[in-house]
């Protein structure tokens, strides 16, 4: 029986963190969960998956969008009466815990999985960064946008991620003390970064 392993990846937008997470999943034969968690949470909760997507890693979404997003709710009096951002977070947390319990190896991208699974001894928590200009270039290439648009997308997106993470974890998003390992992916490239993290994981577990 192989050893259980859970890899939680936090990442700056445009850093290549999601790609590296997929490479690590292949390296360690793990199941990969990014937006897939939203689908599982939607099935468990009775909410539409679109609602989880629009609320994904954003704090305060419900306060500003409550009135115009109600059609995205599934047809359930229970969930309508218990409707709050905390309830969405709880459904998502339950989905992450269930996946971690049901699989011997998995990789989670974002969504405070490192905090949700903080009592699990099989976790390795990694945060992936890159210089702003590198991330802007990556976002421009991926989305076909201007540098100014890419910078705005990064700054707005990371502001939301930080608020979300800090609120639910009482830790600080992107700060070294919140993770086992932080690494700048621009130094070694995607494959090299994956190799370094993989070596760290083998030594760590």
Give the location of each predicted region.
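Glycine-rich phosphate-binding P-loop
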Residues: 9-22
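Small-molecule kinase domains that catalyze NTP-dependent phosphoryl transfer to phosphate-bearing small molecules
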Residues: 62-71, 146-190
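Short beta-strand-centered segment that lines the nucleotide-binding/catalytic pocket of NTP-utilizing
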Residues: 31-42
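Pre-Walker A (Motif I) flank of P-loop NTPase domains
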Residues: 3-12, 104
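ATP-dependent small-molecule kinase phosphotransfer cores
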Residues: 42-105
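RNA pseudouridine synthases
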Residues: 99, 106, 116-119, 138
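Conserved phosphate-donor/acceptor-positioning beta-strand/loop module used by diverse small-molecule
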Residues: 119-143, 147-157
């Amino acid at each position: 029986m192989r050893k259980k392993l859970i890899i939680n990846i936090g990442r700056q937008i445009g850093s290549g963190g999601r790609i590296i997470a997929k490479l690590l999943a292949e390296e360690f034969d793990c199941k990969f969960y990014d937006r897939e968690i939203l689908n599982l949470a939607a099935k468990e909760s009775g909410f539409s998956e679109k609602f989880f997507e629009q609320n994904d890693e954003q704090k305060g979404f419900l306060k500003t969008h409550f009135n115009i997003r109600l059609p995205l709710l599934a047809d359930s009096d229970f969930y309508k009466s218990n409707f709050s951002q905390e309830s969405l977070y709880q459904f998502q947390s339950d989905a992450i815990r269930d996946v971690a319990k049901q699989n011997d190896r998995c990789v989670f991208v974002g969504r405070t999985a490192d905090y949700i699974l903080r009592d699990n001894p099989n976790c390795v928590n990694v945060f992936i960064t890159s210089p702003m200009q590198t991330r802007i270039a990556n976002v421009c290439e991926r989305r076909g946008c201007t540098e100014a648009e890419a910078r705005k997308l990064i700054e707005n997106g990371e502001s939301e991620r930080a608020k979300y993470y800090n609120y639910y974890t009482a830790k600080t998003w992107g700060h070294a003390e919140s993770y086992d390992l932080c690494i700048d992916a621009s130094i070694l490239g995607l494959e090299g970064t994956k190799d370094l993290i993989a070596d760290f994981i083998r030594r760590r577990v």
